From Swiss-Prot:
Molecular function terms from GO: chlorophyll binding; electron transporter, transferring electrons within the cyclic electron transport pathway of photosynthesis activity; iron ion binding; oxidoreductase activity, acting on diphenols and related substances as donors, oxygen as acceptor
Binding site for [CaMn4O5] cluster: 170, 189, 332-333, 342, 344
PTM notes: Tyr-161 forms a radical intermediate that is referred to as redox-active TyrZ, YZ or Y-Z. C-terminally processed by CTPA; processing is essential to allow assembly of the oxygen-evolving complex and thus photosynthetic growth.
Stabilizes free radical intermediate, annotated site positions: 190
Residue stretches spanning the membrane: 29-46, 118-133, 142-156, 197-218, 274-288
Chain residues that bind a quinone: 215, 264-265
Organism: Cyanidioschyzon merolae (strain NIES-3377 / 10D) (Unicellular red alga)
Site (Tyrosine radical intermediate): 161
Subunit and partners: PSII is composed of 1 copy each of membrane proteins PsbA, PsbB, PsbC, PsbD, PsbE, PsbF, PsbH, PsbI, PsbJ, PsbK, PsbL, PsbM, PsbT, PsbX, PsbY, PsbZ, Psb30/Ycf12, at least 3 peripheral proteins of the oxygen-evolving complex and a large number of cofactors. It forms dimeric complexes.
Catalytic activity of the protein: 2 a plastoquinone + 4 hnu + 2 H2O = 2 a plastoquinol + O2
Entry's Gene Ontology BP terms: photosynthetic electron transport in photosystem II; response to herbicide
Phylogenetic placement of the source organism: Eukaryota, Rhodophyta, Bangiophyceae, Cyanidiales, Cyanidiaceae
Annotated propeptide span(s): 345-360
Name the record gives this protein: Photosystem II protein D1
Length: 360
């Protein structure tokens, strides 16, 4: 009898815990994905802060030339970063217990791998938590679908790209100038500016910003006045009101006359779906582009593609870009390679686009 009561009490305790985890009445919804998300993001955040402030230099290239990334070792907010795991580690899973000591783990950049893996699990769980809360509230699942775009982008630069390149040292550093360095080196090695999927991503981000600004300004310009001239228009809106707060017909008419009739949406639902889908699809395509370039399926190469009738090269902007790529590749990791692969495997390229005339 006593054992039965204990089992019932423990079962009730578990049921109460489950009800609390999945309750939509909490100030912040936790959910089962939140059980995984919270410790992962807390771990990633705490280790990032500690490493950014105090981590010792990391031998990123695996050639015994440590690179300083933390504030305590001479960096500032702009130059500081969590330096990626050493090239000597490659793609090996490198938790603390795999190193001979904590000093060795820090020297080989173990914190980077710890932060990145916990962060990716955390943001993926956040996406799942969005779906879970939508499901509990009876909503459609498009919020988590939209968030899948930044999740895909983060996964591409922090996981897929290092896998394709064979080392976590090729992942994006966790800092401002480190991010810029990653972008420049990525351009030098993969010609990302000439990749169609990157172009689609640029169109998605800038187009999304443009459409957001257009939509916000149109709505703000066609608000239905519910207040006097001496009050803010915003005071005319009551949360949860059933009537429209702006005149969609006026906004539609304005924009249709500004551009042309069919450039303006007459359906608010399809308009907002478009506003959500445009940047999401663009960022999806960029993440796919990064993931393909990770395995060296690079951007288009139009170098020396225009020649005259006598076979002489007429340089285009593609050749200028190629020259910049070679220059960046020469400068980065200058002690890790004897010579950049692109330069070593091709014929000699003249430094100047045209040879200067020399007077005798």
């Amino acid at each position: 009898m006593t054992a039965t009561l204990q089992r019932r009490a423990s079962a009730n305790l578990w049921e109460r815990f489950c009800a609390w985890i999945t309750s939509t009445e909490n100030r912040l919804y936790i959910g089962w994905f939140g059980v995984l998300m919270i410790p992962c993001l807390l771990t990633a955040t705490c280790v990032f802060i500690i490493a950014f402030v105090a981590a010792p230099p990391v031998d990123i290239d695996g050639i015994r030339e440590p690179v300083s990334g933390s504030l305590f070792y001479g960096n500032n907010i702009i130059t500081g970063a969590v330096v990626p795991t050493s090239n000597a580690i490659g793609l090996h899973f490198y938790p603390i217990w795999e190193a001979a000591s904590v000093d060795e783990w820090l020297y080989n950049g173990g914190p980077y791998q710890l932060i990145v893996l916990h962060f990716l699990i955390g943001v993926a769980s956040y996406m799942g938590r969005e779906w879970e809360l939508s499901y509990r509230l009876g909503m459609r699942p498009w919020i988590c679908v939209a968030f899948s775009a930044p999740v895909a982008a983060a996964t591409a630069v922090f996981l897929i790209y290092p896998i394709g390149q064979g080392s976590f040292s090729d992942g994006m550093p966790l800092g401002i100038s480190g991010t810029f360095n990653f972008m420049l080196v990525f351009q030098a090695e993969h010609n990302i500016l000439m990749h169609p999927f990157h172009m689609a991503g640029v169109a998605g981000v800038f187009g999304g910003a443009l459409f957001s600004a257009m939509h916000g300004s149109l709505v703000t310009s066609s608000l239905i006045r519910e207040t006097s001239e001496n009050e803010s228009l915003n005071n005319g809106y009551k949360f949860g009101q059933e009537e429209e707060t702006y005149n969609i017909v006026a906004a539609h008419g304005y924009f249709g006359r500004l551009i042309f009739q069919y450039a303006s949406f007459n359906n608010s639902r399809s308009l907002h779906f478009f506003l959500g889908a445009w940047p999401v699809v663009g960022i999806w395509l960029t993440a796919i582009g990064i993931s393909t370039m990770a395995f060296n399926l690079n951007g288009f190469n139009f170098n020396q593609s225009v020649v005259d009738s006598e076979g002489r090269v007429i340089n285009t902007w593609a050749d200028i870009l190629n020259r910049a790529n070679l220059g960046i590749e020469v400068m980065h990791e200058r002690n890790a390679h004897n010579f950049p692969l692109d330069l070593a495997s091709n014929s000699v390229v003249p430094v100047a686009l045209t040879a200067p005339s020399v007077e005798a």
